[in-house]
């Protein structure tokens, strides 16, 4: 079976690993996954990430916990292959009143909703994280 939505697979692996209280989760790497991992690290949702290039590139994400609880409380895929969600800068959603972040793919790269608003660009809303 082929993987139809690699980003949804990444988010599901992170969610499952945190429920199992794993410290590191690995997955096949791609440019988009690395860009999303960079945003998650910059926002403090993960401790770090690393790309190992053996035969196939693997992305390893070091998960972050606070007082025994996962830092990522909720992660949801918004735009999916069957229903893409493109938003202008005015329509970019705020997650939980601004406490969480939306990760947006713009023509200036993958960034948070706050960074996209500051840059004055809209784009495809990939996922929300709280």
From Swiss-Prot:
GO molecular function: rRNA binding; structural constituent of ribosome
Keyword line: Ribonucleoprotein, Ribosomal protein, RNA-binding, rRNA-binding
Gene Ontology CC terms, in alphabetical order: ribonucleoprotein complex; ribosome
UniProt keyword Metal-binding present: no
Biological process terms in GO annotation: translation
InterPro entries named among the record's database cross-references: Ribosomal_uS8 (IPR000630), Ribosomal_uS8_CS (IPR047863), Ribosomal_uS8_sf (IPR035987)
Record keyword Electron transport present: no
UniProt function note: One of the primary rRNA binding proteins, it binds directly to 16S rRNA central domain where it helps coordinate assembly of the platform of the 30S subunit.
Family: Belongs to the universal ribosomal protein uS8 family.
Subunit structure and binding partners: Part of the 30S ribosomal subunit. Contacts proteins S5 and S12.
Record protein name field: Small ribosomal subunit protein uS8
Species, as recorded: Pseudomonas fluorescens (strain Pf0-1)
Gene name for this UniProt entry: rpsH
């Amino acid at each position: 079976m082929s993987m139809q939505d690699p980003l949804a697979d990444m988010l599901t692996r992170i969610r499952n690993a945190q429920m199992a209280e794993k410290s590191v989760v690995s997955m096949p790497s791609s440019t988009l996954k690395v860009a999303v991992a960079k945003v998650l690290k910059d926002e403090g949702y993960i401790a770090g990430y690393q790309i190992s290039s053996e035969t196939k590139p693997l992305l390893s994400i070091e998960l972050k916990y606070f007082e025994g609880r996962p830092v990522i409380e909720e992660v949801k895929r918004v735009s999916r292959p069957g229903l893409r969600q493109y938003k202008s800068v005015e329509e970019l959603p705020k997650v939980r009143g601004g406490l969480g972040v939306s990760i947006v793919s713009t023509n200036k790269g993958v960034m948070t909703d706050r960074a996209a608003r500051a840059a004055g660009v809209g784009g495809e809303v990939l996922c929300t994280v709280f």
